[in-house]
């Protein structure tokens, strides 16, 4: 049985089919009306126990109808009317629509990275060129100063540098003696006490295996008696001195005379102090003259030579009794006579 146009037109909402009219049949054919746009799908499925009995032919049925308010011709393909744009261009779902901005952003970032890399490269190249130029000028200045120093350097009698710390490296002290212990005072280390260099030599010998009594002290210092808190200070750790401008011995005496300075001895200072203390304030000028004459000579004279200084004929030890000193001594005698007469 076929479905006519008039009978299918009654399926518009609001109208009902007659209950006795068979909508579905096995020989399915219909004429599509003009007011139906897209789809009229009629699905006829057999039941789970399909037989040739026509009573089982309409087990499942679905009708989907879409209506168009403006009916068009049925010969128009639905895809052409749905995808046509007003300007006539076709809308394509290309991947370039999404990948285009991504590629553009990535390209811009890569260009920025390349620009910054070039800037860094040129700046580093310029810095390296300046560094090489500075090193070349520095080497030239060093060589020039070395040449000037070599030309102007004179032979000096002693070391006349700056602050210098002498420490003896040759009897390697054990580690337990270099770490101070808490039984000692924090501010007064007993290893740096007042008998600095009591057993040390006057002249510091060069480092090496020197066979002196200081090396034998290692046996005593590493023994079990020195592990406790009461150990005797060793001479090796104290053998150090500080020199300001001249090489010094351990006790602090200079090893070489400094040119341009006159060495003064303790004996001459004591001699001058005793002379100046025995006179009154009126004799200060004469005392100064006596001090200037005895300072340089008392270091070089023996005790027996101090009584006959005028009899010396050594040209290197010249003690002049000048006529000026004779005149001053005569004036002093006259002045003392006048004072005695006055009193």
UniProtKB/Swiss-Prot annotation:
One of its GO terms (cellular component) is Golgi membrane. Residues 71-84, 290-299 have a biased composition (Low complexity). Residues 280-289, 301-311, 322-333 have a biased composition (Basic and acidic residues). The chain crosses the membrane at residues 96-116. Residues 66-89, 161-191, 252-343 are annotated as: Disordered. Residues 165-188 have a biased composition (Polar residues). Keywords: Golgi apparatus, Membrane, Transmembrane, Transmembrane helix. It is found in: Golgi apparatus membrane. The keyword Transmembrane applies. It is a single-pass membrane protein. The keyword Transmembrane helix applies. Signal peptide: none annotated. It comes from the Eukaryota. Residues 334-343 have a biased composition (Basic residues). This is Uncharacterized protein C36.11. It comes from Schizosaccharomyces pombe (strain 972 / ATCC 24843).
């Amino acid at each position: 049985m076929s479905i006519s146009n008039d009978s299918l037109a009654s399926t518009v909402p609001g109208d009902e089919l007659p209950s006795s009219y068979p909508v579905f049949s096995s020989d399915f054919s219909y004429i599509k009306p003009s007011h139906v746009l897209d789809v009229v799908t009629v699905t006829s499925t057999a039941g789970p126990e399909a037989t040739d009995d026509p009573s089982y032919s309409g087990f499942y049925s679905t009708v989907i109808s879409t209506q168009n308010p403006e009916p068009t011709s049925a010969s128009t393909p639905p895809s052409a009317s749905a995808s046509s744009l007003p300007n006539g261009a076709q809308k394509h779902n290309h991947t370039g629509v999404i990948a285009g901005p991504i590629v553009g952003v990535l390209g811009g970032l890569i260009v920025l990275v390349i620009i910054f890399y070039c800037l860094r490269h040129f700046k580093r190249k310029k810095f390296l060129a300046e560094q090489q130029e500075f090193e070349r000028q520095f080497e030239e200045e060093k060589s020039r100063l070395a040449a000037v120093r070599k030309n102007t350097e004179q032979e000096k009698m002693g070391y006349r540098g700056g602050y210098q710390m002498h420490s003896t490296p040759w009897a390697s002290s054990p580690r337990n003696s270099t770490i101070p212990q808490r039984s000692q005072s924090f501010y007064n280390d007993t290893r740096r006490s007042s008998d600095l260099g009591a057993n040390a030599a006057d002249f510091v010998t060069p480092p090496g295996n020197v066979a002196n009594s200081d090396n034998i002290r290692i046996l005593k210092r590493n023994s079990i008696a020195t592990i406790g808190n009461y150990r005797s200070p060793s001479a090796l750790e104290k053998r150090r001195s500080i020199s300001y401008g001249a090489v010094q011995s351990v006790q602090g005496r200079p090893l070489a005379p400094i040119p341009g300075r006159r060495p003064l001895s303790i004996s001459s200072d004591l001699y001058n102090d005793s002379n100046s203390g025995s006179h009154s304030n009126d004799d200060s000028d004469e005392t100064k003259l006596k001090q200037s004459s005895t300072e340089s000579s008392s270091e070089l004279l023996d005790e027996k030579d101090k009584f006959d200084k005028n009899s010396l004929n050594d040209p290197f030890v010249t003690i002049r009794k000048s006529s000026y000193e004779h005149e001053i001594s005569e004036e002093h005698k006259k002045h003392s006579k006048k004072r005695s007469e006055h009193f």
